[in-house]
A protein has these predicted regions:
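Membrane-embedded alpha-helical bundles of multi-pass transporters/translocases
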Residues: 1-168
Length: 168
C-alpha cells in the first residue's frame, strides 16, 4: 500500500507552483494580464476535461506489457515534467500561445499519470475496505506532497531573505 501511494507524494508537489505561483507569474511578472492568463489556463483545463476520458479508454484498451498501467504513468511523467519545466522557465517573450501550449502539454502529462494511477489503485484489491485503505493512504501521501512543497517554499523564501546565494 505504501509503495503504491508513494508516487502521489511526487505527483502533488507541483500543484502549488502551478495553481498559486503560475497565474501571478504570467499575469503580472510577464505582463500578460490576469484576465488573459486566467482565460489561457481555463482553455488548458477545458482541454484536460476532454482528454481524461480519452486517456481512460486508451489505457484500458491498449495495455502496454504486463503491468499495463505503469508505462502510461512513466510516459505521462516525462511529458508532465517537460511541460512543467517550460512553464516555470519561459523565454522573456513568452506570450499567451506559449502559456496555453505548455499548459496543455503539462495537463496531458498529468492526465496520462493520474488516470492510470487512480485506476491501478482500484484494481489492487476486490475488497471494499482494503480499497478504501489504499485510497486513504494514497490521498494522505498527496497531502504530504502539497505540504512538502509549502515547506520548501517557506524555507527557500526565508533562506533567500537571509541573503543565501545560489552556487553556480
Amino acid at each position: 500500500m505504501l509503495i503504491y501511494s508513494f508516487p502521489a507524494l511526487a505527483i502533488s508537489i507541483p500543484t502549488i507552483p502551478i495553481y498559486i505561483y503560475l497565474p501571478t507569474f504570467y499575469g503580472v511578472t510577464l505582463e500578460l494580464g490576469l484576465a488573459a492568463t486566467g482565460f489561457a489556463l481555463l482553455l488548458a483545463r477545458v482541454f484536460d476535461t476532454i482528454t481524461d476520458p480519452i486517456v481512460g479508454i486508451i489505457s484500458d484498451r491498449f495495455p502496454i506489457k504486463r503491468n499495463y498501467r505503469k508505462p502510461w504513468i512513466a510516459i505521462g511523467s516525462i511529458i508532465a515534467a517537460i511541460g512543467l519545466y517550460q512553464l516555470l522557465n519561459p523565454a522573456n517573450d513568452a506570450g499567451i500561445v506559449y502559456l496555453i501550449s505548455w499548459s496543455i502539454i503539462l495537463y496531458l502529462g498529468w492526465t496520462l499519470v493520474a488516470v492510470p494511477y487512480l485506476t491501478w489503485g482500484a484494481e489492487l484489491s476486490t475488497d471494499y475496505n482494503e480499497r478504501t485503505s489504499i485510497t486513504t493512504t494514497r490521498e494522505t501521501a498527496g497531502i504530504l506532497g502539497i505540504l512538502t512543497c509549502g515547506v520548501i517554499f517557506v524555507l527557500s523564501t526565508n533562506l533567500n531573505s537571509l541573503k543565501w546565494k545560489q552556487s553556480a
